[in-house]
Amino acid sequence: MTRKLFGTDGVRGTANTHPMTAEMALRLGAAAGRYFRPVGAGSPRVVIGKDTRLSGYMLENALTAGLTSTGMNVLLLGPVPTPAVGFLTRSMRAALGVMISASHNPHEDNGIKFFGPDGFKLSDEAEAEIEAILAGEIQPAQPGNIGRAKRIEDGRGRYQEYCKTTFPSGLRLDGLKVVIDCANGAAYRAAPEVLWELGAEVIPVGVEPNGKNINLRCGSTHPEAAAEAVRAHGADVGICLDGDADRVIILDETGKEADGDQIMALFAARWADEGRLRDGTLVATVMSNLGLERFLGARGLRLERTPVGDRYVVEAMRRGGWNLGGEQSGHIVMTDFATTGDGLLAGLQFLAAMAQTGRRASDLARSFETVPQLLQNVRYAAGQEPLKAPGVQAVIRDAEVRLNGAGRLLIRKSGTEPLIRVMAECEDEALLRDVVEEIVAAVRDAA
């Protein structure tokens, strides 16, 4: 059974355009409700969270209508981080969790992703079954079994209190000046409050959402404003989240960025020293830098690579029993604490390292020298398959021959946008540029 509607991170699209319409959200809610509440079953609960996009109101109401039509009782959380939905699904014994968000995308986009009762994102197989239900006639509940919906006020507070329990007991952030950039997104209240309650002096950025400014010149994909705040306020560190707070980028005291690879390297080394890194293994995607792999190997640790997407990182971690993984983009998954990437929890672990060692952020955020890496994205028209073009395939084969033994090449379609991502790594930067530019030109000609 294959998926057509679901991508690597749920269903995404432009708001009010298929599939992100009220009509589709209603049917998707009904299909998910029927999947999680077989005909004749009781009235299980669903938790629904969202980020701060204007279209979230529309999709929230449509999903609620679809879910209640199949007998599910809906608890509306309001704006909360994606990892909060995973946490609350499990802690509140819900049968299903739903997050309405397009993560780091602009406000015009939105998305819907589902969490199972264990708090983990659904498998490809479960999503395919929901699509199959969606394609048919969805049987509604009997009139007396229609579900109820209510808004709950303490969901965010429950998550915030849990976040604080993951911080080392007895450790405080007193005297530490922290810039926190919430991307005008889902964590705009939770993240500053948690940091302040742990003792930090907090300088908030991106905490004035208006429905249209999520990820706009702020957050993990646009950390310039946070970097300027770090320098202007003489802050010790900056933490940049994306719109749904499931990814993080760290800024040192000079405003310089550390991506997910550097964060994972620090955590892996520290956890290995403390005997906490299970089986000496870190799980990361094919996009992670070759320098990370070399750093781990020099310490007798292993890198397990997966396809791109934090869900595939989590699936590999669960299969192998490993407890640390993530993506270069800033998804950091720590299954000792959470069921999905959690930018705030990862930020807290970085701050704990600073507080425990007394070292500066710049010392901790540079664990290894990166191998030169070049990534370019090429947009293509709907219905096109540029990677199947003979000319593109010939250029790719030539690039593989030229890089053989000297570097690494990765070309893939984005799972969330109509983009071809062309990435290469090589110590020879001239060769690196030539290879990527030739492939990009060929893909553009075919797109």
UniProtKB/Swiss-Prot annotation:
Its EC number is 5.4.2.10. It is an enzyme of class 5 (isomerase). It holds the Pfam family PGM_PMM_III. PROSITE patterns: PGM_PMM. Keywords: Isomerase, Magnesium, Metal-binding, Phosphoprotein. Activated by phosphorylation. The active site is at 103 (phosphoserine intermediate). One of its GO terms (biological process) is carbohydrate metabolic process. GO terms for cellular component: cytosol. Its cofactor is Mg(2+). The modification Phosphoserine is found at residue 103. Transmembrane segments: none annotated. GO terms for molecular function: magnesium ion binding; phosphoglucosamine mutase activity; phosphomannomutase activity. Binds 1 Mg(2+) ion per subunit. Mg(2+) binds at residues 103, 242, 244, 246. It catalyses: alpha-D-glucosamine 1-phosphate = D-glucosamine 6-phosphate. Catalyzes the conversion of glucosamine-6-phosphate to glucosamine-1-phosphate. Belongs to the phosphohexose mutase family. This is Phosphoglucosamine mutase. It comes from Cereibacter sphaeroides (strain ATCC 17029 / ATH 2.4.9).
